[in-house]
Amino acid sequence: MTRIIVGIMGPGDGASAHDCDRAAQLAGLVAAEGWILLTGGRSAGVMEAASAAATRAGGLTIGILPGTDWTQASSAVAVAILTGVGEARENINVLSSRVIFVCGISAGTAAEVALACKAGRPVIFVSAARETIDFFRSLHARFETATSPHEAMTIARQLLAPAP
């Protein structure tokens, strides 16, 4: 059986401490669930916080990197995939993830959410700002919201549960 890969997406450079804390908490829960964590793979912001927390919790981490330089990868990424496609890697991130958790927002993260909505991938915003929710709601995007990492995991389990 194929293992479940879930993505944690959020700002790299410029990520808030709150976004990184939520991502780290969530990544620990993802690892405890036995799911594989996918991030953008760099040693910055939400990507680093999530990868490091999942690794500490004994989880497997995958990083989808924009360039062709191994040194871009976080040391907490177990499987680094160099794409050489720059920001277009966001589509790989989205299509490789069964569920996308969003911790914070940036231009790159917004692009990932838009791609996920177009591809029909479940998106769960974790402690998102009202402006972010209102923006994506104005696009008629389908997504879930959670106020905590634990609530986000409950939603993800429901979304990933086999149909009866």
Can you say where each PLM-predicted feature lies in the sequence?
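Generic N-terminal amphipathic, Lys/Arg-enriched alpha-helix
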Residues: 2-19, 28, 32-33
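Acidic/glycine-enriched connector segments
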Residues: 21-28, 41-119, 129-135
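Catalytic binding pocket for nucleotide-activated donors in carbohydrate/polymer assembly enzymes
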Residues: 131-145
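A positional/architectural concept
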Residues: 34-35, 39-42
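A charged, well-structured terminal subsegment
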Residues: 99-100, 146-164
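Short acidic-hydrophobic, aromatic-tinged amphipathic segments that line or gate anion-handling sites
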Residues: 80-84, 126, 141-155
